Amino acid sequence: MTPIPSDRLDAILARHEFVTAQLADGSADAESIVQLSRELSELDGVVAAIRHYRAAEANLAGIRALIDEPGGDPEMRALAAEEKPEAEEALEQAHRALQLMLLPKDAADEKSAILEIRAGTGGDEAALFAGDLFRMYAKYAESKGWRVEVISESEGTVGGYREVVAEVKGRSVFSRLKFESGAHRVQRVPDTETQGRIHTSAATVAVLPEAEEVDIAINEADLKIDTMRAQGAGGQHVNKTESAIRITHMPTGVVVFVQEERSQHKNRARAMALLRSKLFDAERTAKDSARAADRKAQVGSGDRSERIRTYNFPQGRVTDHRINLTLYKLEEVMAGPALDEVIDALVTEHQAELLAAEGMA
């Protein structure tokens, strides 16, 4: 086990004591109370882990002292020797739990998310695959009790989507879906294939934390806002009013388009929320890319050009290339809930990378 510096743990305990005293004092203003309460709720879990770790440390030290005591009671020494493996295991578990609690937190993890799926190479088959991916994430969200709301969609000519953008609302959505960003590849025999040949198609997935107004400031003077009639499949107009909204953020060139609502006002609000999330994500990505380059991270880099996963239908196989994980349960993964097995493995690998970067591996 890599030792955890005692002075670091003492500093956390001291901060917890200080914040508790500040809240008990009652002299802080309302805004400070909110911030202190939030900090205290985060510290409570870490402090409990520190105390558990130190209790496990003390217990093992006591057992070792009994075993090593010269002239000690043989019966007590034998009993201590029996208890030692269990005490060592308990300390190792407490050490691991505390290490994870001490890892740098991603402030966006608690947020809802924006999910974007775009068909890539492969024509109609790519659009169908994009639709399959969207249904997989929708079913996964349902299994978690999250809510999915489509912001914009462009359907494929034979089904699926050329592009679909949706909000996934719920607690800690981003913490689970953030590793899905990247290029997804499918290998299967299309329904239209008469020779039984396997085709390869692709779709790209982007997952952004849903930003709030406090997360990023947008100057209205930087926006170019266009209104137009909403369009359906094939480009035909589906209503006579100009309810669709396209917003361009001039300094960055980021463009968002929303037409799902019949009301122009509602579409504008949704477009602004989407723009906010895109700009917030761009800021985060720039910072994360620098950190990822420093630690040569394989997971969580958020590189959307990277091929991250292959879905091979003839073999019933899902392979995540970042961690060399292969599961022969493609149907279960596409059905939603079994996606947890892939995400859990990615989270574990990401934590290992963070531990190494922090010198705690």
Swiss-Prot record:
PTM per Swiss-Prot/TrEMBL: Methylated by PrmC. Methylation increases the termination efficiency of RF1.
Residue list for modification N5-methylglutamine: 236
Keyword Metal-binding recorded: no
Region entry Disordered, spans: 285-313
Entry-linked InterPro entries: PCRF, Pep_chain_release_fac_I, Pep_chain_release_fac_I_sf, Prokaryotic/Mito_RF, RF-1
Pfam families cross-referenced by the UniProt entry: PCRF, RF-1
Location(s) in or outside the cell: Cytoplasm
Molecular-function GO term, any one: translation release factor activity, codon specific
Top-rank taxon: Bacteria
Basic and acidic residues: compositionally biased ranges: 285-309
Example of a GO cellular component annotation carried by this entry: cytoplasm
Keyword terms of this UniProt record: Cytoplasm, Methylation, Protein biosynthesis
SMART domains for the chain: PCRF
PROSITE patterns: RF_PROK_I
Primary location class: cytoplasm
Function recorded in the entry: Peptide chain release factor 1 directs the termination of translation in response to the peptide chain termination codons UAG and UAA.
Family of the protein in this entry: Belongs to the prokaryotic/mitochondrial release factor family.
HAMAP family xref list: Rel_fac_1
Name the UniProt record assigns to this protein: Peptide chain release factor 1
Source organism (scientific name): Methylorubrum populi (strain ATCC BAA-705 / NCIMB 13946 / BJ001) (Methylobacterium populi)
